[in-house]
Amino acid sequence: MERIKELRDLMSQSRTREILTKTTVDHMAIIKKYTSGRQEKNPALRMKWMMAMKYPITADKRIMEMIPERNEQGQTLWSKTNDAGSDRVMVSPLAVTWWNRNGPTTSTVHYPKVYKTYFEKVERLKHGTFGPVHFRNQVKIRRRVDMNPGHADLSAKEAQDVIMEVVFPNEVGARILTSESQLTITKEKREELKNCNISPLMVAYMLERELVRKTRFLPVAGGTSSVYIEVLHLTQGTCWEQMYTPGGEVRNDDVDQSLIIAARNIVRRATVSADPLASLLEMCHSTQIGGVRMVDILKQNPTEEQAVDICKAAMGLRISSSFSFGGFTFKRTKGFSVKREEEVLTGNLQTLKIKVHEGYEEFTMVGRRATAILRKATRRMIQLIVSGRDEQSIAEAIIVAMVFSQEDCMIKAVRGDLNFVNRANQRLNPMHQLLRHFQKDAKVLFQNWGIEPIDNVMGMIGILPDMTPSTEMSLRGVRVSKMGVDEYSSTERVVVSIDRFLRVRDQQGNVLLSPEEVSETQGMEKLTITYSSSMMWEINGPESVLVNTYQWIIRNWETVKIQWSQEPTMLYNKMEFEPFQSLVPKAARSQYSGFVRTLFQQMRDVLGTFDTVQIIKLLPFAAAPPEQSRMQFSSLTVNVRGSGMRILVRGNSPAFNYNKTTKRLTILGKDAGALTEDPDEGTAGVESAVLRGFLILGKEDKRYGPALSINELSNLTKGEKANVLIRQGDVVLVMKRKRDSSILTDSQTATKRIRMAIN
C-alpha cells in the first residue's frame, strides 16, 4: 500500500509525467536489453517504426545501376546516403514496387518443379469440394499426423545427402547414397533442375518438403491422412466442422494405406503356415508396393498399426513401446505391476489360466473411434473415463476395458464354453477368448457389472447397462466424457523380440502385439501390391492358385525337370505346391498323389514314355502325402469356380489346355506361359545338334555329379566329363572334345550313341 501511495504522489507532480513521456531512455540495462544479440526483441514495433521512415530497406550498391533514382511519379527510390556501418544503399519501399513492375524477368519453367508441393496443393484445393458447416461439439484428440502431402519417406539423414547431391554437388563431404529411392530421386531431380536460377537454399528447403515426412501432434476429429491435415484449419473449429472432400490423392497416403493392407494380409497368411515367422519374412522380402520393395518401405515408414509393427519387429526394427489389446493401443502412464498365473472359473465352470497383473496402474486407451483413461488395481477396475463417436464405439471400449481389468464379475458373466480358435485352428489365449466372447454379446457382462449413483461433474455423464446415457446412474466406475483422450505423443521406439508365432515382446517380456490383434477389416489397396511369394497366391482365390502354380512350373521348368528325374521327393516338398493342395478334394488328395507318383516312376523306368506336358499337368497332385493303392484315374478333380473341375490325365480340358501348335498353356482361359522346349517325342535331332563338340561316353555315371541341362553344358572346359539330361528325361555321360576339328561328325554319331547309351 505504501508503495502505491508513493507512486500516486509522484504521478501528481507534473515533472514526473514529463520525465516519463518526454526524456530519452538512457538506462544501461534497458539499452542492453534491446541491443544485445542479433535476435529482434520486439519485431512488430521494429517493423512499424522502420516503415515510417523514408528508406527502411538496405540494398547492395549495384542497385543504383539497376533502378532509376526516381519513378514515373517523380518519387525518390533510393537515397545517396550510405547505410550507417555498412557500404549499402538506403532504399524506399517504392523501389520494390518499381522492381516488381519493371525489373528483369526470368524463365519460369523451374517454378512448378521447385515449388511442386505448393502447385499440387492448389490443384487439390481447386478440385476439392467443401460441404456445409455444422455446429456441434467437436471431440478432438491429439494424434501424430502427417503434415505435408506428396512426400517421399526418406530419413532426415538420407534426405540431407540427396539434397546436397542435387543442390550442392561440388561441396566437399562424404555422401553415400545407398537406398534405391535415394538414387532414383537424385537422378530425377538433377534432370528436372538443370539450369535452374532459383536460389539453391530455396531449392534445398523445397526438396526437404518433398522428401521427408513432417509429423505434428495435433488435435483432430476426423480424417488423419495428410490431404485432410493440410486443410485442418478450414474443416474443424472448437464448435464447428466443415465437410470436405479432397480434390486428389497423394502417394504418401496411398503408401500408408496399402502398406497396412499388405501387412495384414501377410500376417494373416503367415499365421496358418508351419513356421509363421519364416513365412512372414519370406513374404515381406518378396512383396512390392507400388513398385517399391516392402522391406524398404517398412524401414522408412513410421505408420503404427498392429500388422505393420509385427512385420517391423520380424525385421529387427524398433517399434513403439505401447501395446495392443482388442484393437486399442494401451499406454501405461502411471504405476507398475507384476505378473502371476492364476486359475479362475467362468460362469460355465470352465477353468481358465490367466496371467494376472498385480498392482495399481493407469492407462490411456486409443482406438480409431473411441478413447479412454483406465485406472485399475489387481483384478479391479477403479475408473474408466471413455469418449467416442457413438454408442457402439463407446460400448467397444467399455468391453475391452472390462476384460482387461480381469475382474471376477466379468469372468463369471461368461455363459457357455469358450473355444475360439485363430486362423490356424489353434485355441486363442484366455484373455482373447474372453474378449471374443463378450465382443459377440456383452449383455450379461453389462447386467452383472453393477451400477452406482453419480455426482454431477462438468463434462461427464453416466452410461447405463443398455448403453443409454444418464445423469443419475452409471455402470460402476464408468463415465462418458465429452473430451477425447490424446494419443500417446512420444515417437520413442524400443528394441523388441518376436517368437515363432509372431508374438512381439518388449525387453521386460511383456507381450506388445500378437496376430490376434490384427484387424480383420478388408480394404482395397490404392497402390498395386505384388506378392511374389507362393504363399500369397490364395489371396485372389482358387483360380489364381491354379494359374500361378502352373506358371511357376513353366518358369522353372529347367530345374524342375532335373529334380523330377533325380530327386523327386525334394521336388514334391516344394512350398510352391502347398497352396494347390487346398484345391484338391480332401478325400482324394493322397490317392491322387499315390497314383501320380507311381505314374512318374514308370516314366522314369520305361524308355520313351517321358511326356513334358503330362508331367507339368500332374506334378502339383504329387505333392500331397501319397497313399499306396492300386487306384487308377482318368481325370483328377480341382475345386475352382465354386465347383469341381476335371483335369484329364491324358488330353486337354478347360482347366488345363496345351496347344501343340502355339506351344502355349491356357488355364481356365488364362494364358499361363509357353513351353520353351519341344515336348513332342523323338526330337533327338535337336539334341544331337546341341551336343556337337561333345563325345557321348555311355550311361550316366554318378561320380560326375548331378545331371546338367543342355544349356549348362557350355560351362564345361575341354576334356571335362559330365552327366547331361537329354531328350525326354534320359541321362548320359559326355565329355567335351579337346579338338574342334571333329565337331562335324558328332551330330551323326550322337544320335546312334544316345540310343546305345540308353539301351
Curated annotation (Swiss-Prot):
Keyword list, A-Z: Cap snatching, Eukaryotic host gene expression shutoff by virus, Eukaryotic host transcription shutoff by virus, Host gene expression shutoff by virus, Host nucleus, Host-virus interaction, Inhibition of host RNA polymerase II by virus, mRNA capping, mRNA processing, Viral transcription, Virion
Q: Where is this motif: Nuclear localization signal?
A: 736-739
* Disulfide topology: none
Q: Which GO terms describe its molecular function?
A: RNA binding; RNA-directed RNA polymerase activity
The UniProt entry's GO CC annotations, sorted and at most eight, read: host cell nucleus; virion component
Swiss-Prot/TrEMBL site (Avian adaptation) positions: 627
Q: Which InterPro entries match?
A: Flu_PB2_2nd, Flu_PB2_6th, Flu_PB2_C, Flu_PB2_CAP-bd, Flu_PB2_middle, Flu_PB2_N, INV_PB2, PB2_helical
Single GO BP term: 7-methylguanosine mRNA capping
What's the chief localization of this chain?
A: virion
Can you say where in the cell this protein is located?
Virion; Host nucleus
State the oligomer form and interacting partners: Influenza RNA polymerase is composed of three subunits: PB1, PB2 and PA. Interacts (via N-terminus) with PB1 (via C-terminus). Interacts with nucleoprotein NP (via N-terminus).
Name the job this protein performs.
Plays an essential role in transcription initiation and cap-stealing mechanism, in which cellular capped pre-mRNAs are used to generate primers for viral transcription. Recognizes and binds the 7-methylguanosine-containing cap of the target pre-RNA which is subsequently cleaved after 10-13 nucleotides by the viral protein PA. Plays a role in the initiation of the viral genome replication and modulates the activity of the ribonucleoprotein (RNP) complex.
By sequence similarity, the record places it as follows: Belongs to the influenza viruses PB2 family.
Q: What is this protein called?
A: Polymerase basic protein 2
Q: What is the lineage of its organism?
A: Viruses, Riboviria, Orthornavirae, Negarnaviricota, Polyploviricotina
